[in-house]
């Protein structure tokens, strides 16, 4: 293995086609992202078949662009990393098959990467991970608290018992009447409202780090339905603020409690919802008050991208994790199954 390790990484788990060249797990030489938001906006959400077709159309040119932007060739690449799951199976297979083709044609190791592990390692691209740490994972499909003793060590200490936080945001956004993608729209609207609606904060058991957002989601939907039935005025900004404050209060409260209990050196935030301005502000304030070292990636690294897959892929490569040409994609994958004890 050369002193400088270059990873070509591919991410296609949902509605972004992305290819990145990462040096030594931390330096981004290129990170090309093709977004499909405009294509899915008219449907009000991601349509799996449409997503897969866009990946097929864009994957080859995205690979070429990533290599050209990094001023490198496949001969310089040490390994090919690709998202194995979780995600939309058709979308995943486009990236996996492209990665297999490159690995086979150029005789490079093939590295399977868990999508959420990638989100965790997005932090490492801007600020070194400091173990032990707690990772708050917040996305459209995941809400988890993960304890990490060291690189590639994942222990889930809390998770949602029903809806993921991003799922709740999207449903509330649609009920308010906001366009896709709903999460950022709610966040932007919440900045202009007041916490005037009494929505529940679901804490569950006293010592539990688990989450539940289905009750809150239903409370918001029912409140809006009842107000509309009565013909009463709805302050949409206040609804957004009240909903977001309910979400953020629970997320921050449980996360800070976990950090104290596990005596960690760092709190990192991972996933698309990590770009939420309200969450970032509340976490920053809480961590400052409790003397907790906080790391949240830049918004461009919170959403799906291949740079994060390359960062995680580098450490998997160093640990000797590779796959053969039988590599498959999966809708659901437990991050603990990807844990490597060093």
UniProtKB/Swiss-Prot annotation:
Any Pfam family the entry gives: TsaD
Function in brief: Required for the formation of a threonylcarbamoyl group on adenosine at position 37 (t(6)A37) in tRNAs that read codons beginning with adenine. Is involved in the transfer of the threonylcarbamoyl moiety of threonylcarbamoyl-AMP (TC-AMP) to the N6 group of A37, together with TsaE and TsaB. TsaD likely plays a direct catalytic role in this reaction.
The protein's name in its UniProt record: tRNA N6-adenosine threonylcarbamoyltransferase
Source superkingdom: Bacteria
Main localization category: cytoplasm
CC cofactor note: Binds 1 Fe(2+) ion per subunit.
Ligand binding (substrate): 137-141, 170, 183, 187, 276
Swiss-Prot/TrEMBL keywords: Acyltransferase, Cytoplasm, Iron, Metal-binding, Transferase, tRNA processing
UniProt cross-references to InterPro entries, sorted A to Z: ATPase_NBD, Gcp-like_dom, KAE1/TsaD, Peptidase_M22_CS, TsaD
EC numbers for this chain: 2.3.1.234
Catalytic activity: L-threonylcarbamoyladenylate + adenosine(37) in tRNA = N(6)-L-threonylcarbamoyladenosine(37) in tRNA + AMP + H(+)
Any one GO molecular-function label of the UniProt entry: N(6)-L-threonylcarbamoyladenine synthase activity
Residues that bind Fe cation: 115, 119, 304
Record GO biological process: tRNA threonylcarbamoyladenosine modification
GO cellular component: cytoplasm
Family: Belongs to the KAE1 / TsaD family.
Transmembrane spans: none
Cofactor: Fe(2+)
Subcellular location: Cytoplasm
PROSITE patterns named among the record's database cross-references: GLYCOPROTEASE (PS01016)
CDD domains xrefs: ASKHA_NBD_TsaD_bac (cd24133)
